[in-house]
């Protein structure tokens, strides 16, 4: 496999131009395309060697952690919604990073099986993402109209429906991340 690193680097720089666009525009642009050939494979290596944060498994690469830290500092979300709690390590890590950056927020982390511990500023919610009912299961969106929101889709289930549903509640300045740890 011959990887063109200069192409990957240039593609990454160009990708910043369309950073703040609607989900529909992003879907149209990326339909059946790999925008940055080779890069996802290169930077995802090591994700499953399990970095730990405190005693919790953290399914993130060092690169992910740097990007998230920068994003959290820039966006400063008042509410973080995470679909796919896993072990809960990601939510704990984000809560600690936000505190270290000097701002308060609350994290709502949803999974079909919620982690079995409590942590300041995090609410773990047992939730089957196949039964999207925003009004019943995600009341925080109704009450978050004047707050900056960061949504992270990392559940890998019913992704299209989740994105379409969540998109109705997002506004300019909010952020949506789709990841696959």
Language-model features: locations:
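A short alpha-helical cap/connector motif
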Residues: 1-151, 155-181
